[in-house]
Swiss-Prot record:
SMART domains per record: KOW (SM00739)
Lineage: Bacteria, Pseudomonadati, Pseudomonadota, Alphaproteobacteria, Sphingomonadales
Keywords linked to the UniProt accession: Ribonucleoprotein, Ribosomal protein, RNA-binding, rRNA-binding
Any one GO MF annotation of this record: structural constituent of ribosome
InterPro entries named in the record: KOW (IPR005824), Rib_uL2_dom2 (IPR014722), Ribosomal_uL24 (IPR003256), Ribosomal_uL24_CS (IPR005825), Ribosomal_uL24_KOW (IPR041988), Translation_prot_SH3-like_sf (IPR008991)
Reported function: One of two assembly initiator proteins, it binds directly to the 5'-end of the 23S rRNA, where it nucleates assembly of the 50S subunit. One of the proteins that surrounds the polypeptide exit tunnel on the outside of the subunit.
Protein name as annotated: Large ribosomal subunit protein uL24
Length: 105
């Protein structure tokens, strides 16, 4: 199946604690059905002091979020949209359903 969400896409979060926020996909994990979005689903890890990190402390990082909880941001309106595929100039391209605009990538 073709990838509807790819690295570099602008997405809107549909549900959860970050609902309504926008971000960019930094990593797609298609085998797991998850994506990592910049600034979304931030988790905190408590790190013990070690030789590599003598101070220890709190590490904040982005955790994967289910791909079903994000939607592509429409390039024209900035709202969530579904994606369909079409062949234009002999190439398969992704198209935003709401506006008909081509999605880069």
């Amino acid at each position: 199946m073709a990838a509807k969400i790819k690295k570099g896409d602008r997405v809107v979060i549909l549900s959860g604690k970050d609902k309504g926020k926008h971000g960019e996909v930094t990593q797609a994990l298609p085998q797991e059905g998850k994506v990592i979005v910049s600034g979304i689903n931030i988790i905190t890890r408590h790190r013990k002091p070690s030789q590599a990190n003598p101070q220890g402390g709190l590490d904040r990082m982005e955790a994967p979020i289910a791909a079903s909880k994000v939607a592509i941001e429409d390039p024209k309106t900035g709202k969530a949209t579904r994606v369909r595929f079409d062949v234009r100039d002999g190439k398969k391209v992704r198209i935003a359903v709401k506006s008909g605009e081509t999605i880069n990538g």
